[in-house]
Design a protein with these regions (language model features):
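Conserved short alpha-helical segments that host acidic/polar catalytic motifs at enzyme active sites
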Residues: 1-202
Length: 202
C-alpha cells in the first residue's frame, strides 16, 4: 500500500444553549482536512427560527478555500454538520460535494457520509424502480434517499435512520440532520471512525 487512504471526514454539532455552531464546524473541518482534500461543505439550521430552514454551502476545494470568512459569515445556526471529501465512489465534481441536502414530503434532511457500501447497486436499483432521480454519482445520495423514503412511514427521523441502517452493507459513518435533530451512526463493526464529544452544553 502506497499510503493511508483516509477517505472523507464528517462532523456534527448541536449547541443546546442556542449558540452559533458555524465557527466550530469550520475549525472541526479544518482539523479533519487530512481525511479529504477534494471538496467540503456545511449545512446548518436554526432550531429557534423558521421550521425547516436548512442552509448549506459546499464546493470543490480545501476548507480554507470553500468556507472563506466572507462566506461563513452568511450562515448561522445552533445545529449543523460538515464534510470533507476524498472520493472513493463517484467522480470528483461539485455535484458530489457534501453535505447532501434533500427536500421531501416530511421536510428537509441533510447528510454527511464517510465510507463505502458493497450493496449500493441493489439499493439504488430499488429506488430507481420507484421513480427516484439521482443528481450525484455517490452512494451517499442512495443512503439519503432511503432515509427520506423510510421517514414517510415512520414516526421519527431516528426510526428512519435505524431502518435504513439495517439495509446497509459495508463500512460507514454518517451524520444526519433534520431542522431540529442531529443523529450520528456508524457501521456495526465500527470500521469507520465516529467519536462523540461534549463541551459545556454543546
Amino acid at each position: 500500500m502506497a499510503g493511508i487512504k483516509e477517505e472523507c471526514g464528517v462532523f456534527g454539532i448541536y449547541d443546546l444553549d442556542g449558540g452559533n455552531v458555524v465557527p466550530s464546524i469550520y475549525y472541526g473541518l479544518t482539523s479533519l482536512q487530512h481525511r479529504g482534500q477534494e471538496s467540503c461543505g456545511l449545512a446548518v439550521s436554526d432550531t429557534k427560527g423558521e421550521r425547516g430552514n436548512v442552509k448549506f454551502h459546499k464546493d470543490l476545494g480545501l476548507v480554507s478555500e470553500v468556507l472563506r470568512q466572507d462566506v461563513v459569515r452568511k450562515y448561522e445556526g445552533d445545529i449543523g454538520i460538515g464534510h470533507v471529501r476524498y472520493s472513493t465512489t463517484g467522480a470528483s465534481v461539485a455535484e458530489n460535494a457534501q453535505p447532501l441536502v434533500l427536500s421531501y414530503v416530511k421536510g428537509t434532511l441533510a447528510l454527511a457520509h464517510n465510507g463505502n457500501l458493497v450493496n449500493t447497486p441493489e439499493l439504488k436499483w430499488e429506488l430507481i424502480q420507484n421513480g427516484a432521480i439521482f443528481h450525484t454519482t455517490t452512494d451517499s445520495e442512495v443512503i439519503a434517499f432511503h432515509i427520506a423514503r423510510e421517514r414517510v412511514h415512520t414516526r421519527t427521523v431516528e426510526d428512519a435512520v435505524l431502518k435504513t441502517a439495517h439495509k446497509l452493507k459495508g463500512a460507514y459513518a454518517l451524520v444526519v440532520m433534520s431542522p431540529r435533530k442531529l443523529i450520528g451512526i456508524r457501521d456495526p463493526l465500527g470500521l469507520k471512525p465516529l467519536c462523540l464529544g461534549k463541551r459545556d452544553n454543546t
